[in-house]
UniProtKB/Swiss-Prot annotation:
Main location: secreted
A GO CC term assigned to this protein in UniProt: extracellular region
Any one Gene Ontology molecular-function term assigned to this protein's record: heme binding
Protein name stated in the entry: Extracellular globin
Signal sequence extent: 1-18
Protein's cellular compartments: Secreted, Extracellular space
Comment, domains: Consist of two tandemly linked globin-like sequences which probably each bind a heme group and a C-terminal extension which may act as a cement between the eight subunits.
Record organism: Pseudoterranova decipiens
Keywords linked to the UniProt accession: Glycoprotein, Heme, Iron, Metal-binding, Oxygen transport, Repeat, Secreted, Signal, Transport
Residues carrying covalently attached carbohydrate according to the record: 216
Record keyword Iron present: yes
Domain Globin: 25-167, 174-318
Amino acid sequence: MHSSIVLAIVLFVAIASASKTRELCMKSLEHAKVGTSKEAKQDGIDLYKHMFEHYPAMKKYFKHRENYTPADVQKDPFFIKQGQNILLACHVLCATYDDRETFDAYVGELMARHERDHVKIPNDVWNHFWEHFIEFLGSKTTLDEPTKHAWQEIGKEFSHEISHHGRHSVRDHCMNSLEYIAIGDKEHQKQNGIDLYKHMFEHYPHMRKAFKGRENFTKEDVQKDAFFVKQGHKILLALRMLCSSYDDEPTFDYFVDALMDRHIKDDIHLPQEQWHEFWKLFAEYLNEKSHQHLTEAEKHAWSTIGEDFAHEADKHAKAEKDHHEGEHKEEHH
């Protein structure tokens, strides 16, 4: 009973806070209008003029307009429509903030729209957008600290949701591409795993040293060795698990750590650069298996997984190093 009361109070406070955030931000948007009036159109143009002047790094996302000045933005009809689009998005995000389900769904739709238009904007750029937007509003009206904080809160939740959406999208693209390297007991499925090692031994011969007793193998030797049937299945299964868990960040990170621990247990100590290099190898192999039919979105998705895998592997290596150094110091005390 007590826990139910506490939960109800927490929920009430959260809803009240979201409603207050919405109220403050909606009030400030009176100075960044949407509509067909001349004033509203100019508000949208002014947002992009401010962006192009103070955040020039964002210009590269506007093809053929990368070298625009604020004066160029003012004269280009493109920014009349685009300005209203971006202000409308800000209005909707603000208006739905106290309805989290709708807010999250709208963020997802915005991300999907950018994907359909082949506009790839890194998450950190989205984060910077909210700094820019708050500065822009501050140039149109006086923003008090509670209002600035309210917009920062919306920006933070927006960033959280795009991170969640982004991981879903990466997972979906990678899962689609795995049709080219199915795993199982059929001969062609076993061959998929063997082919990965054949590619490795042919094009990345320095990686052979991790395979004791097989350091001088050719790709023909790999084909004939039953070891690579089992090993090929293992590595393709691991890749599938990394892909399927990618939208669950804690599970993905834990699985990477488990893979690192397994290699250490088996006395396989790969240089960190080889973990990074593996993803280049895998991209080549997968593109070859797809007969060069991988989409750019699929290639980008695997690159993203590779970067996050390598980042987590680096963290694991540092933790291991710190642990061993700590043990070494204790031995000498």
